[in-house]
Amino acid sequence: MTSSINILLLLHPTVVTDAQLVEQIKSKIYQSHNNNNNNNGGTTTTTTGTVNINLNQQIIDRVTKGIIELPYDYYDEIIYINPNNESQYREIPISLMQLIYKLLKSNGKFKGDLPLDQNLDVLMTGFIIEEEEKEKEKEENNLEGELVNVWVKPIPVDEPVVTLLKKKTTTSNTTTIKKSLPLFKKLNKDEINNSDKDINNDNITNNNNNNNNKRKLVETKLTYFSSDDENSSDGSVLENDDIDDDDELIDENDLLNFNNNNNTNGGSLLSDKLITPRKCDISLNGGKKRKKACKDCTCGLKELEELEVSNQQNLQDQILGKLAQSATLEAIKIEERLKQQQQQQQQKVKVKFTEEDLSEIDFTVQGKTGGCGSCALGDAFRCDGCPYLGLPPFKPGEVVKLDGFGEDI
């Protein structure tokens, strides 16, 4: 029984220049699939049959640029050879990862000199990272190999198929019972009229009860206020016959007058009957003021809070106004200082040279000498700022002229 293994060997451009290295890599690949049996080039013989190894060699740059087109879902293994040891030179672009994922079969492996700092990109592409022992030349001595990462393309999981149950069809022998809608009995006209009469009677009784309750409430109010008013201001008792229906109404002015007259006796009608709002006492709250006044405050706390807020705002406005005034004054002072400095600079005495100072100097003429009197002798006798530096010594009778000497001064 024969089977085939398709292997793609991706080589770095630097590896292609060494033909012996490429042949060694190929021989190692054939040996790894030998399984300790006979090997003839690309064919491996096992106990169960022969295995044909189809090895395809490509340069990774050509595959990345799309110069060479490879079949999808074809290769069992893809081996990448990169001689660079530094991780920054082993980076694989994401587009190449996706292409390798498409070239591999399910459960196919991508191994070799892989980068170690791109695990997130590998997982996002769809690979599974596994560890595998690296093959060494010392495997003949039964030494354990170094663990390296291998990218495996997972086997796709088949989605479970859910079968829908069919509706049961009734046979001809079975009889189906259909549920009918509920039936309601229709009322006669006599019953409707009787029900309307009952409803009207109930409404009449309810109205009578409400009127009786209102009358009782009025009577209690009248008895409450008339109990104190039966004694007149003269001390005479009013009889029940003298009290009419109009006299039962109480005037507010009479109550106020009555209250003022009875203040001297230690009691008043308004103080006993009326309920005045209680002021907020700070001592009852442990000496602490309430955080905020009530929504419907009537004790005056809300007005006090508004007054405090307005006082604080006025104080802040005063402070800000003073700061603004001081800032403007400082700015005015700074501007005045700058103006004074500019005026002082303008008033400084400017150095002006006369025509004799700006005229050309001839040291060969008697009486025309420099400040040191030795400029005509040469550079050895000239000062650092002498305009004749670099010129040879002057000869008697030689005319020396300097162009633009006045501009330098």
Curated annotation (Swiss-Prot):
Segments carrying motif Cx2C motif 1: 372-375
Function: Component of the cytosolic iron-sulfur (Fe-S) protein assembly (CIA) machinery required for the maturation of extramitochondrial Fe-S proteins. Part of an electron transfer chain functioning in an early step of cytosolic Fe-S biogenesis, facilitating the de novo assembly of a [4Fe-4S] cluster on the scaffold complex CFD1-NBP35. Electrons are transferred to DRE2 from NADPH via the FAD- and FMN-containing protein TAH18.
Subunit structure comment from the entry: Monomer. Interacts with TAH18. Interacts with MIA40.
Placement of sequence motif Cx2C motif 2: 383-386
Linker: annotated span: 154-262
Chain segments carrying region Disordered: 195-215
Disulfide pattern: none
Protein family: Belongs to the anamorsin family.
Annotated spans, Fe-S binding site B: 372-386
Gene3D superfamilies the UniProt entry points to: Fe-S cluster assembly protein Dre2, N-terminal domain (3.40.50.11000)
GO biological process assignments: iron-sulfur cluster assembly
Taxonomic path: Eukaryota, Fungi, Dikarya, Ascomycota, Saccharomycotina
Location within or outside the cell: Cytoplasm; Mitochondrion intermembrane space
Keywords: 2Fe-2S, 4Fe-4S, Cytoplasm, Iron, Iron-sulfur, Metal-binding, Mitochondrion
Domains as described in the record: The C-terminal domain binds 2 Fe-S clusters but is otherwise mostly in an intrinsically disordered conformation.
Entry cofactors: [2Fe-2S] cluster; [4Fe-4S] cluster
Stretch list, region Fe-S binding site A: 280-299
GO molecular function annotation: 2 iron, 2 sulfur cluster binding; 4 iron, 4 sulfur cluster binding; electron transfer activity; metal ion binding
Record's GO cellular component terms: cytoplasm; mitochondrial intermembrane space
Annotated residues for binding of [4Fe-4S] cluster: C372, C375, C383, C386
Binding site for [2Fe-2S] cluster: C280, C294, C297, C299
Spans annotated as N-terminal SAM-like domain: 1-153
Stated name of the protein: Fe-S cluster assembly protein DRE2
Xref: InterPro entries: Anamorsin, CIAPIN1, Dre2_N
The keyword Iron-sulfur is annotated on this UniProt entry: yes
Top-rank lineage group of the source organism: Eukaryota
